[in-house]
A protein has these predicted regions:
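Feature marks short, surface-exposed loop/turn motifs that line or immediately flank catalytic pockets
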Residues: 11-13, 60, 87-91, 134-136, ...
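Structural motif corresponding to the early beta-alpha repeats
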Residues: 78-104
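Active-site mouth loops of central-metabolism enzymes
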Residues: 15-37, 95-111, 136-137, 235-238
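Beta/alpha (TIM)-barrel catalytic core signal, keyed to glycine-rich beta->alpha loops juxtaposed to Asp/Glu
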Residues: 132-309
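Short, well-ordered coil/turn segments that N-cap beta-strands
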Residues: 2-5, 50-53, 75-79, 122-126, ...
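Active-site groove signature of glycoside hydrolases
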Residues: 116-139
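N-terminal binding-site loop/beta-alpha segment at the start of enzyme catalytic domains
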Residues: 1-84
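Short, acidic/polar
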Residues: 30-46, 103-121, 167-179, 247
Length: 309
């Protein structure tokens, strides 16, 4: 992959997101112009820190437009871009919108959204992923959609899928089975893995062993692992570092993890996140963090209860 730390723009392409500490990070100035300026600043800082993979999605508000404009200005010549389809942003740039996004994994939605992504990102788009592929969505059983994906793959675009929810492992294993003429349909998988929710680990190890690229999202559990008085504060203090670095370093300690995504909303955060590649966690710290794991159903219920802010 392009770099061991990537940058996801979920927090920067729209005015609200599910993230603890967002009010502190962004304040009240969240106009489109303000968010685009912030996004450019963070992209500049990420690139300067060595980050070469950027991850967006159709549902991340104007993230694709912000990123496309930044790239067209020549500011990230070595950046590899991945985007996702399957959710549509409905927030209308309102902080109080009742519905921020809606999921639709139909073939019609794919055709519409890949055209939109290509219009905004052009030739910069290298990887296109199903957004939150789950067993219950039926996406892996939709033969018309899979045939459409195959034709897109044959045109040269790399395909992947992301997962969410307590049954991530089952979705990963199911997605790995899809093949075209004996070759994998999906070259990458992007999943949630963190010290609170490590249940997808064995399936991700299987994906890595099979030659797929493994990208990790939500390594900081939507900000829950970033506080000095949070679950990783003690470990970070003993190691003389910060909780965000510990959270990301815990992912890098997994031999199957290729890229861990930073969800930074500020320049300071992305610089700190990028430096996590230099943090080596001792065995006793890793063992202590293993004790933090929650039952997947509890973790995802807690996540679902987080407010958009």
């Amino acid at each position: 992959m392009a770099s061991r730390i990537g940058l996801g723009l979920a927090a920067l392409g729209r005015p609200v997101y599910i993230d603890v500490g967002r009010d502190r990070d962004l304040g009240s100035e969240r106009t489109r112009a303000a968010m685009e300026a912030r996004c450019r600043e963070v992209l500049d800082a990420a690139y300067a820190a060595g980050i070469r993979y950027v991850d967006v999605a159709r549902s991340y508000g104007d993230a694709e437009a912000f990123l496309g404009a930044w790239l067209d200005a020549g500011d990230g010549s070595e950046v590899v871009v991945g985007s996702k389809w399957g959710y549509t942003y409905l927030g209308g740039w309102r902080l109080d919108a009742d519905v921020q996004e809606v999921k639709d994994l139909s073939v019609a939605a794919f055709r519409r959204q890949i055209a939109e992504s290509r219009r905004l990102l052009g030739d910069h788009l290298s990887l296109y992923q199903i957004h939150s592929a789950t067993i219950e969505s039926g996406v892996f059983d939709d033969r018309e959609l899979l045939d459409e994906l195959r034709s897109v793959r044959e045109s040269g675009l790399v395909l992947g899928f992301s997962t969410s929810g307590p049954q991530q492992a089952e979705a990963i294993v199911r997605g790995l089975r899809e093949r075209v003429d004996g070759e994998p349909l999906f070259s990458t998988v992007q999943s949630t893995w963190n010290v609170l929710e490590p249940s997808a680990g064995p399936a991700l190890a299987e994906a890595h062993a099979d030659g797929r690229g493994v990208l990790i999202k939500e390594a900081m559990a939507n900000g829950r692992l970033g506080a000095t008085d949070g679950p990783l504060g003690g470990v970070a203090g003993r190691l003389g570092t910060t909780p965000d670095r510990v959270a990301l370093a815990a992912v890098h300690a997994q031999p199957w993890a290729d890229v861990v995504l930073s969800g930074a909303a500020t320049v300071e955060q992305v610089r700190s996140n990028a430096s996590a590649v230099d943090v080596m966690l001792p065995d006793d710290a890793l063992a202590a963090m293993n004790e933090l794991a929650q039952p997947p159903a509890r973790y995802w219920a807690d996540r679902a209860a987080l407010p958009w802010r």
